[in-house]
Amino acid sequence: MGIKDWPEGEGPRDKLLQKGAGQLSDAELLAVLLRNGLAGLNAVDLARSLISEFGGLRNLLCAPRNQVCRLPGVGPVKYAQLQAAAELARRVAQENLQRGQVLTNPDLTRDYLMRQLADRSYEVFAVLLLDSQHRVIQFVELFRGTIDSASVYPREVVSLVLEKKAAAVIVCHNHPSGIAEPSQADRRITERLKNALATIDVSLLDHMVVGDREIVSFAERGWIN
């Protein structure tokens, strides 16, 4: 049965308007974005099948286009709608950490970095630039791909810091595997960056590794002195 044939108020769009988006299941929210299903499968059923196929919303939203569009009922238009929704969520998070904001709340930083990096299917190394009062200057993605001690260049980080006149930085990167535990390569990168930044009297406050559901802080583990 198509959603249009459901009793009034029971469809996901009606339910959202009457009760609020927070009352919808993952499949119902996804169905609102998909708008319609395909022959023999309404939008909610299609949404459930997609969530099941990819093992969750996060995996679905960060899956490559060719993997999503190969499935029945999902073409370029629906893929674009899903990507637009994911990008809007990231931009909302970015607005929550605006230029000039003082970083006094570690949870705000964690939430921001989680939203920016947790859903990436590839590794990203980024720098959060701060002034002498620990106010945000800018968040910059510097490197993409396999992040190891050979692919992160301290001189590029130093060059960016000098260009933006930052006084302190927090570096971060994600693990697409979802496991946030830092590797030995991560620790080597951190030591090289700390030493390079020290030559220009800039503090490395932390290196945060973003996983699927957690963030590991080098500072909290006592790995940055």
Curated annotation (Swiss-Prot):
Residue ranges of domain MPN in the record: 102-224
GO-annotated biological processes: proteolysis
Binding sites annotated in the UniProt record for Zn(2+): 173, 175, 186
Keywords from the UniProt entry: Hydrolase, Metal-binding, Metalloprotease, Protease, Zinc
Matching Pfam families: RadC, UPF0758_N
Gene3D superfamilies, sorted: Cytidine Deaminase, domain 2
Matching InterPro entries: MPN, RadC_JAB, RuvA_2-like, UPF0758, UPF0758_CS, UPF0758_N
NCBIfam families cross-referenced by the UniProt entry: PRK00024.1, radc
Family in the record: Belongs to the UPF0758 family.
PANTHER family in the record: DNA REPAIR PROTEIN RADC, UPF0758 PROTEIN YEES-RELATED
Protein name: UPF0758 protein Sbal_0377
Organism of derivation: Shewanella baltica (strain OS155 / ATCC BAA-1091)
